[in-house]
UniProtKB/Swiss-Prot annotation:
This is Peroxidase P7. It comes from Brassica rapa subsp. rapa. It catalyses: 2 a phenolic donor + H2O2 = 2 a phenolic radical donor + 2 H2O. GO terms for molecular function: heme binding; lactoperoxidase activity; metal ion binding. The modification Pyrrolidone carboxylic acid is found at residue 1. The record marks 38 as: Transition state stabilizer. Substrate binds at residue 139. Ca(2+) 1 binds at residues 43, 46, 48, 50, 52. Keywords: Calcium, Disulfide bond, Glycoprotein, Heme, Hydrogen peroxide, Iron, Metal-binding, Oxidoreductase, Peroxidase, Pyrrolidone carboxylic acid. The lineage of its organism: Eukaryota, Viridiplantae, Streptophyta, Embryophyta, Tracheophyta. Disulfide bonds join 11-91, 44-49, 97-292, 176-201.
């Protein structure tokens, strides 16, 4: 039901408006590209790509922003809200927040040197959000390979899609609380890498939990295939990263992406399109929010 030209007459300047908003945000803070990409991922895995993650909590409404996977780590809301304001000025009441997020995720990847793809649009915005669904549906950094495969399979994404999409960890940062167990307790880790990461992540739980480390030690603000090379050298930061190359069924996919940037880029773009197709609201379902943080 989604098409690439859904707004071509109703909002002809949409793509350029989103692109310029992303460009200024990511040039002033390169990490923001990863943050926006992650927002889209966390949106799509909870009742589909419906903009539900963008709804702010109120006294009478509990949404997804304070679910475990998002609290203190989801960011980029202001960037999306600012882009939405600019789009509203140009085409009031036409473009959904869900679509703006989908386009911004693509623009973030491109801005950091990654592949381009045509974003399908026509999604509408959810009128509700579910903290419980966010807690249960978003893949966790502690997951095993089989759990990751199941989690992606539940939303129609293949094992290959899962490995390609994990390659998004070529950009962005992770908090110590999410890699502490790996750098202190696991053995399938490069020793020098473990020591380096321990420096900014104290062993004691609760100590330095929010300290950040780059998911890709080589090029944290370049969208490239070095994430996969790191996995082959046992320098995956999260448990859920290293399980992709640990003697299991996905080793060959990691090896392939490590050898061929072009095959990673094309598979990543295809998987992003598939992820963007998860359970959209279309037709008369949902609404077009006036502001992304609250329902109309």
């Amino acid at each position: 039901q989604l098409t690439t030209n859904f707004y071509s007459t109703s909002c002809p300047n949409l793509l350029s408006t989103v692109k310029s908003g992303v460009k200024s945000a990511v040039s002033s803070q390169p990490r923001m590209g990863a943050s926006i990409l992650r927002l889209f991922f966390h949106d799509c895995f909870v009742n589909g790509c419906d903009g539900s993650i963008l709804l702010d909590d109120t006294s009478s409404f509990t949404g997804e922003q304070n679910a475990g996977p998002n609290r203190n780590s989801a960011r980029g809301f202001t960037v999306i809200n600012d882009i939405k304001s600019a789009v509203e000025k140009a085409c009031p009441g036409v473009v959904s927040c869900a679509d703006i997020l989908a386009i911004a995720a693509r623009d973030s990847v491109v801005q950091l040197g990654g592949p381009n793809w045509n974003v399908k649009v026509g999604r509408r915005d959810a009128k509700t959000a579910s903290q419980a669904a966010a807690n249960s549906n978003i893949p966790a950094p502690s997951m095993s390979l089989s759990q990751l495969i199941s989690s992606f399979s539940a939303v129609g994404l293949s094992t290959r899609d899962m490995v390609a999409l994990s390659g998004a960890h070529t950009i962005g940062q992770s908090r110590c609380v999410n890699f502490r167990a790996r750098v202190y307790n696991e053995t399938n880790i490069n020793a020098a890498f473990a020591t380096l990461r321990q420096r900014s992540c104290p062993r004691a739980a609760g100590s330095g939990d929010a300290n950040l480390a780059p998911l890709d030690i080589n090029s944290a603000t370049s969208f490239d295939n070095s994430y996969f090379k790191n996995l082959m050298a046992q320098r995956g930061l999260l448990h859920s990263d290293q399980v992709l190359f640990n003697g299991g069924s996905t080793d060959s996919i990691v090896r392939g992406y490590s050898n061929s940037p072009s095959s990673f880029n094309s598979d990543f773009a295809a998987a992003m399109i598939k992820m963007g197709d998860i359970s959209p609201l279309t037709g008369s379902s949902g609404e077009i929010r006036k502001v992304c943080g609250k329902t109309n």
